[in-house]
């Protein structure tokens, strides 16, 4: 994801930083204030232009597929299934998974291009307060999330087995290997795309207008929940995930921990679904499911937060720190 960084910008030190910058630095949700010539309407215009770019990219991808489907009857029959099914995870039809996640992945170039066009240099500030995706911290939080969720799923399925439910994985499907490869390649980008939009762009959009982080953490949650077609318990779990991911983004000064949590959560569900241990197409949940997932997410959040403090992970951007990086700061930063 090196394209997320703005590596060609000459650093400029602001001449008159505001008290907010001088005393505490700028927190993640307020980073739009560090872009050149910040205006209240620029983040909003970024979103509108991003939607336009996104639709244009989708057209470029979809039109050739429709033409091929019209010329090849077998492809046409398969393509019709895309509009009839809600079960996108099928080992017999791995292309359905691609059709599900590829449009989400395409949000990344649309957002980054719109951000660069409207707000100018400093696109890397969508990643973190350092102006880049901190790969070492991302790797560490990936390991932490994996450890937490392995324990979580082991407890859940151990409990089910003790209650007499069959929890026998099935490795016999001939399409299993291809599906696993697709999951390992696509899901990290799908998870990152959602984080850049919902925890990156939307948090900084709200933060450019409202100072308190609670607004930036909570206001985007309904949009994230609406993007997932679950019942009330599933929606509650998704909403809690959104709050935890946003809180971690604010606390750690970047998207890395949220991306790690999202990647591992999705990968574990799909990988277990590949061997018939869970139903990866399920849209319903239960109070027990909600409590279990909440416990796993909260454990991850608490440990990641403490680990970040212990390792000295930067959570605010100061003029000096950003000037050493890749961002052009405006002459005056309004708090």
Predicted regions and their residues:
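Transmembrane helix-loop-helix hairpins at the membrane interface
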Residues: 179-328
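Membrane-embedded alpha-helical segments of transport systems
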Residues: 52-56, 106, 147, 263-269
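N-terminal, membrane-interfacial amphipathic/helix-forming hydrophobic leader that caps
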Residues: 1-122, 282-335
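Helix-boundary and loop/linker segments of multi-pass membrane transporters
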Residues: 33-37, 86-90, 130-131, 169-177, ...
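Residue-level signature of transmembrane alpha-helical entry/exit and packing/kink sites
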Residues: 39-47, 96-100, 104, 137, ...
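Juxtamembrane helix-loop-helix connectors linking adjacent transmembrane helices
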Residues: 99-101, 123-193, 203-205
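Hydrophobic residues within the alpha-helical transmembrane core of Major Facilitator Superfamily
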Residues: 48, 154, 222-223
């Amino acid at each position: 994801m090196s394209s997320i960084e703005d590596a060609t910008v000459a650093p400029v030190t602001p001449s008159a930083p505001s008290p907010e910058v001088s005393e505490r630095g700028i927190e993640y949700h307020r980073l739009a204030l560090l872009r050149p010539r910040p205006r209240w309407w620029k983040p909003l215009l970024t979103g509108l232009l991003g939607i336009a770019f996104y639709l244009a990219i989708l057209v470029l991808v979809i039109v050739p597929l429709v033409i091929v489907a019209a010329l090849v009857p077998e492809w046409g029959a398969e393509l019709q299934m895309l509009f009839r099914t809600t079960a996108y995870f099928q080992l017999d039809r791995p292309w359905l998974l691609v059709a599900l996640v590829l449009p989400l992945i395409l949000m990344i170039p649309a957002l980054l291009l719109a951000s660069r066009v409207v707000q100018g240099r400093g696109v890397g500030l969508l990643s973190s307060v350092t102006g880049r995706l901190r790969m070492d911290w991302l790797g560490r939080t990936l390991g932490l999330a994996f450890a937490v969720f392995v324990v979580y799923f082991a407890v859940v399925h151990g409990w089910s087995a003790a209650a007499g439910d069959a929890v026998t994985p099935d490795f016999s499907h001939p399409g299993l290997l291809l599906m696993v490869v697709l999951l390992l390649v696509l899901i990290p980008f799908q998870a990152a795309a959602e984080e850049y939009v919902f925890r990156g762009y939307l948090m900084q959009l709200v933060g450019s207008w409202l100072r308190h982080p609670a607004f930036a953490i909570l206001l985007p949650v309904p949009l994230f929940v609406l993007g997932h077609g679950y019942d009330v318990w599933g929606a509650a779990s998704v909403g809690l995930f959104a709050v935890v991911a946003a809180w971690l983004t604010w606390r750690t000064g970047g998207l890395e921990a949220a991306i790690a949590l999202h990647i591992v959560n999705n990968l574990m569900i799909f990988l277990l679904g590949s061997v018939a241990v869970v139903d990866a197409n399920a849209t319903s949940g239960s109070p027990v499911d909600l409590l279990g997932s909440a416990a796993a997410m909260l454990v991850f959040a608490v440990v990641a937060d403490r680990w970040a403090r212990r390792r000295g992970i930067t959570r605010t951007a100061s003029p000096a720190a950003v000037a050493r990086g890749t961002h052009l700061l405006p002459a005056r930063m309004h708090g």
